[in-house]
C-alpha cells in the first residue's frame, strides 16, 4: 500500500509538476525516475531511503552524471 502511494506521488510529480519547472537534476536518470525505480525494485522503506539519499546528493556542487539504481 505504501509502495503504491509513493509511486503514484512520484508519477504525479513527473506528469503535473515537473513539466512546469526548469530542469535541475544533474544525474541520469533524474531523481524522480531514480526514486520510482528504487521503490519499485526495493520497496517503500529501502527504496524510499535510497531516494532521499539521492535527492540529498543532487545539488549544484556535486559531480552528477550516470547514477543508476543498483
Swiss-Prot record:
GO cellular component labels: plasma membrane
Designated name of the protein: Putative membrane protein insertion efficiency factor
Matching InterPro entries: Membr_insert_effic_factor_YidD
One Pfam family it belongs to: YidD
Membrane topology: Peripheral membrane protein
Top-level taxon: Bacteria
PANTHER family: MEMBRANE PROTEIN INSERTION EFFICIENCY FACTOR-RELATED
Amino acid at each position: 500500500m505504501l509502495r503504491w502511494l509513493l509511486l503514484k506521488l512520484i508519477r504525479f510529480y513527473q506528469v503535473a509538476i515537473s513539466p512546469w519547472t526548469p530542469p535541475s537534476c544533474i544525474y541520469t536518470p533524474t531523481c524522480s525516475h531514480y526514486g520510482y525505480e528504487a521503490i519499485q525494485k526495493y520497496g517503500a522503506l529501502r527504496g524510499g531511503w535510497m531516494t532521499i539519499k539521492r535527492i540529498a546528493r543532487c545539488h549544484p556542487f556535486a559531480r552528477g552524471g550516470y547514477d543508476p539504481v543498483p
